[in-house]
Swiss-Prot record:
Protein function: Component of the viral envelope that plays a central role in virus morphogenesis and assembly. It is sufficient to form virus-like particles. Seems to be important for creating the membrane curvature needed to acquire the rounded, stable and infectious particle phenotype. Acts as a viroporin, inducing the formation of hydrophilic pores in cellular membranes. Also induces apoptosis. Plays a central role in virus morphogenesis and assembly. Acts as a viroporin and self-assembles in host membranes forming pentameric protein-lipid pores that allow ion transport. Also plays a role in the induction of apoptosis.
Protein name: Envelope small membrane protein
Virion surface side: 1-16
Membrane topology reported for the UniProt record: Single-pass type III membrane protein
Length: 83
């Protein structure tokens, strides 16, 4: 026959609840850590979008404008006789 006391049952149930709570806490901590890593990666991408991309665009555009005004918009040279 089974000799199962109420205190033993409560102890086993308590152990199951404790193991479940520990697993739940570990899961919450791991998910929070992974979410913080994902947030850091997104912030780095945002920094790339807001800082580096416009800077590169402005650099390329200003280089194009410099070439355009420096090469194509030159004033005609005056001949020596015109002076």
């Amino acid at each position: 026959m089974f000799n199962l006391f109420l205190t033993d049952t409560v102890w086993y149930v308590g152990q199951i609840i404790f193991i479940f709570a520990v697993c739940l806490m570990v899961t919450i901590i791991v998910v929070a850590f992974l979410a913080s890593i994902k947030l850091c990666i997104q912030l780095c991408g945002l920094c790339n979008t807001l800082v580096l991309s416009p800077s590169i665009y402005l650099y390329d555009r200003s280089k194009q404008l410099y070439k355009y005004y420096n090469e194509e918009m030159r004033l005609p040279l005056l001949e020596v006789d015109d002076i």
